Amino acid sequence: MGDWSALGKLLDKVQAYSTAGGKVWLSVLFIFRILLLGTAVESAWGDEQSAFRCNTQQPGCENVCYDKSFPISHVRFWVLQIIFVSVPTLLYLAHVFYVMRKEEKLNKKEEELKVAQTDGVNVEMHLKQIEIKKFKYGIEEHGKVKMRGGLLRTYIISILFKSVFEVAFLLIQWYIYGFSLSAVYTCKRDPCPHQVDCFLSRPTEKTIFIIFMLVVSLVSLALNIIELFYVFFKGVKDRVKGKSDPYHATTGPLSPSKDCGSPKYAYFNGCSSPTAPLSPMSPPGYKLVTGDRNNSSCRNYNKQASEQNWANYSAEQNRMGQAGSTISNSHAQPFDFPDDNQNSKKLAAGHELQPLAIVDQRPSSRASSRASSRPRPDDLEI
């Protein structure tokens, strides 16, 4: 019972990893081939060599004539056919077991990370990597599996090899036996003294089984072809619908906005903030931030920003007691951003930097006033 339960679990897992055509193919394989081969066909060919008679008494003549007529028994030929046809499926099952093993490891690691997460450890990146690996192997929630990636390629290759083996064995059977058996076979081979006639037992019954196995092989081949086209067109349909990797958007690089010319700063209107050239009468080291000049949607905002910057700078200097005429004159002419790059270059090159004189407005003390009015020996006479 243990072996049957293990086989049942294996078949259940294969059903989960197969398409509808694959499930039908497995049913045909196990019911109409293996089961029929082990019951009815074996009994029909049980007395094949013993019932093969020739009209001669020469020892060894019947054996050589049987070997010439049937190089390999039909039963053993069909056993080899089932083995070769099942090998691609076994390779696919090996890949399934590999995915199952990966699923167990990933689930165990995910549980450990979730336990660590409850203790306050930041494991979001590791959990994300586990989710990406599960998607890569086709593992989904609640044990569901979607055929994709390497598993899908293995499945397609197995279908191709099964189809090739089916066609090859059909051609070999047609070349060796044909698809029917005759009641009398003529043989002329040593040590037979002359040409002898040999007789086959139950030729009609065996012909019926041969035709039945031929039909089963053709049905299996048709199922493989239908399944191959189904998988191919389903993949094309998924691509047409635009189904992509859901983790691609989160793991891929983010593209910058079209309205932003520089990734340094981003304002509410989508304008960037490259450094503007120095204006006339601006102090050394002072820079204004403006938007992209080539972007017409940002020009009004850049003018307002520059005017506000100058107003703030004027207020700050006035609070410090600096003469406001210079600032007011420079502020009276706000920045303009013409579309012509040549005019902007002339404007930037036509003005030189003029440092502002810092005047100390603190009241002088009495000592200093006396010292300033007292003549000193090194003073010059005018």
Curated annotation (Swiss-Prot):
Q: Which InterPro entries match?
A: Alpha_helix_dom_sf, Connexin, Connexin43, Connexin43_C, Connexin_C, Connexin_CCC, Connexin_CS, Connexin_N
User: Per the database entry, which stretches of residues form a coiled coil?
Assistant: none
What PROSITE patterns does this protein map onto?
Answer: CONNEXINS_1 (PS00407), CONNEXINS_2 (PS00408)
Name of the protein: Gap junction alpha-1 protein
Q: Where is this region: Interaction with UBQLN4?
A: 264-382
Q: Where in the cell is it found?
A: Cell membrane; Cell junction, Gap junction; Endoplasmic reticulum
Q: What residues bear S-nitrosocysteine in this entry?
A: C271
Its gene is GJA1
Modification Phosphoserine, positions: S5, S255, S257, S262, S306, S314, S325, S328, S330, S344, S365, S368, S369, S373
- Cytoplasmic side residue ranges read 2-23, 98-155, 229-382
All disulfide bonds of the chain are: C54-C192, C187-C198
Where composition is biased (Polar residues), the residues are 317-332
Q: Where is this cross-link: Glycyl lysine isopeptide (Lys-Gly) (interchain with G-Cter in SUMO)?
A: K144, K237
Q: Which keywords describe this protein according to UniProt?
A: Acetylation, Cell junction, Cell membrane, Disulfide bond, Endoplasmic reticulum, Gap junction, Isopeptide bond, Membrane, Phosphoprotein, S-nitrosylation, Transmembrane, Transmembrane helix, Ubl conjugation
- Give the quaternary structure: A connexon is composed of a hexamer of connexins. Interacts with SGSM3. Interacts with RIC1/CIP150. Interacts with CNST and CSNK1D. Interacts (via C-terminus) with TJP1. Interacts (via C-terminus) with SRC (via SH3 domain). Interacts (not ubiquitinated) with UBQLN4 (via UBA domain). Interacts with NOV. Interacts with TMEM65. Interacts with ANK3/ANKG and PKP2.
Instruction: Provide a Gene Ontology MF annotation, just one.
Output: gap junction hemi-channel activity
Post-translational modification here is noted as:
Phosphorylation at Ser-325, Ser-328 and Ser-330 by CK1 modulates gap junction assembly. Phosphorylated at Ser-368 by PRKCG; phosphorylation induces disassembly of gap junction plaques and inhibition of gap junction activity. Phosphorylation at Ser-368 by PRKCD triggers its internalization into small vesicles leading to proteasome-mediated degradation.
